[in-house]
Structure formats: C-alpha cells, structure tokens
Regions:
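Alpha-helix N-cap and loop-to-helix initiation/capping positions
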Residues: 8-9, 63-70, 95-102, 130-138
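A cross-family glycoside hydrolase active-site/sugar-binding cleft signature
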Residues: 24-30, 49-51, 86-90, 116-118, ...
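Auxiliary Fe-S-binding modules of radical SAM enzymes
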Residues: 19-21, 108-208
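Catalytic cores of alpha/beta
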Residues: 33-40, 94-106, 162-174
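Alpha-helical scaffolding segments of alpha/beta enzyme cores, especially the outer helices
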Residues: 9-19, 35-42, 70-80, 102-109, ...
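A short acidic, helix-capping loop that chelates divalent metal ions and anchors anionic groups
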Residues: 5, 57-62, 124-129
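Canonical radical SAM enzyme core domain
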Residues: 8-41, 47, 52-56, 91-99
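Short, small-residue-biased leader/transition segments that mark boundaries at the very start
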Residues: 1-7
C-alpha cells in the first residue's frame, strides 16, 4: 500500500536524522511493501516496529480492519530486508493463557528481535473499559515465558507499569531487558528516566 507524499516526507525526515543525530532509527509506519522497507533502510532506519497485538485467535476480537496474516507478512518482509523486527502487543484484552503462549510462539517463528509488552490499563469510555486489570503475578509470568520462548529477543516493558510494584523491578528479574520510560508514548505515564536509571542501577543493569 503506497503512502505517496507522506511516505516521501517521512523518508526525508529519517535521512536527515541519520545524518544529524547519533541515534538508532526505528520506524513505525504500518503496512509497507518490500520496496518501501528497502528505501527506509537506505535512509538509515535499522529497526521497524509493527505489533501483532495479540494471538491469532483473539485478533478478530480486537481488530477488524486487517488480518493477522497481513501483520506476519510485514514482519517477514522486515526480516528479509535485514532490519530488526520490533513486534509485541497488549496483554489483558480478553485473551487467555493459551492466547499469550500462541502470541509468544508467533513472534518466535518470525524471529523478532524486540518484543514490547504492554499490559492493558482499562480506561472509561474505551471499548475495553470493563476488562479486568491484570495482577502483578500474571504480568510477571507472561514476561517469563515470553523470555523462555524468545531467549535472544529484547523484552521491553511498555504500558501498564503502574500495575507493577517498585516501578517494575521484578519484571527485569523475570526476563524483561528494556523499558519505555517517561510519559511520551503511553496513555498513563511510566516512571521518569531518572527513577528508571536508578532502579536499573540498583539491580546491576547497564544504561546508556
């Protein structure tokens, strides 16, 4: 699916950032074809984010505008291009333990390099407002078997850290290896960068 002028402007933005900033570039632009991904790669993008959101069985309950296979095919194109594939989803959206296991296996089969795991924070007025909040043991168990099934991938904590004690310190002891920090990308703010660095230093983890 072509993105026309919007896509061209985004490619230009990545080219500029690649020249002027000493950072790794990760794009999140939805469904792209092989040619578009190659152009992004040439522009300096080394990682592509494309969440599968949930299990194949539960996906139609969450999304009706596209299919699970479309998600998987995009990730395969990312890997074929030689870019890092970043894909995960949200737990607590009505799925059961088998769904979470299937999701972890789907990501392993594609060979994703980074897995952002979010825990749903039910918010009034949204379609999933009545979903039960996950307990900390449930979240930690999920992280642990995602780590077991995807031993080489980065497991990244995303939304839902407010459901964990101690800013999520036990999550890192359960298999998480990275986190989204600050209040820029989640509806409910995460911990601050400073507090996260202090927490990671406390358990002997390195930060940049």
């Amino acid at each position: 699916r072509g993105l026309g002028d919007v896509y061209k402007r985004q490619v230009h933005a990545y080219e500029t950032m690649n020249k002027e900033c000493d950072i790794e570039l990760c794009a999140s632009m939805g469904f792209l074809n092989a040619e578009q991904l190659h152009r992004l790669h040439e522009a300096g993008v080394t990682s592509y984010h494309h969440n599968i959101e949930t299990s194949r069985r539960n996906f139609p309950n969450i999304c009706t505008t596209h299919t699970y296979d479309m998600k998987i095919e995009t990730l395969k194109l990312v890997k074929a291009e030689g870019m890092w594939a970043c894909s995960g989803g949200i737990i607590g959206m009505g799925e059961d333990w088998e769904d979470r296991l299937d999701m972890a296996i789907s990501l392993a089969e594609v060979g994703v390099d980074s897995i952002p795991l979010n825990a749903l924070m039910p918010i009034k007025g949204t379609p999933l407002e009545n979903e039960r909040r996950l307990t900390e043991p449930e979240i930690l168990r999920t992280i642990a078997f995602f780590r077991y099934i995807n031993p080489e991938a980065d497991i990244r904590l995303g939304a839902g850290r407010a459901l964990l004690t101690g800013d999520g310190i036990k999550a890192f002891q359960s298999g998480a290896s990275a986190t989204i920090t600050g209040n820029m990308l989640t509806t409910v703010a995460c911990a601050t960068i400073r507090s996260d660095k202090n927490m990671l230093k406390e358990i002997g983890r390195e930060t940049k």
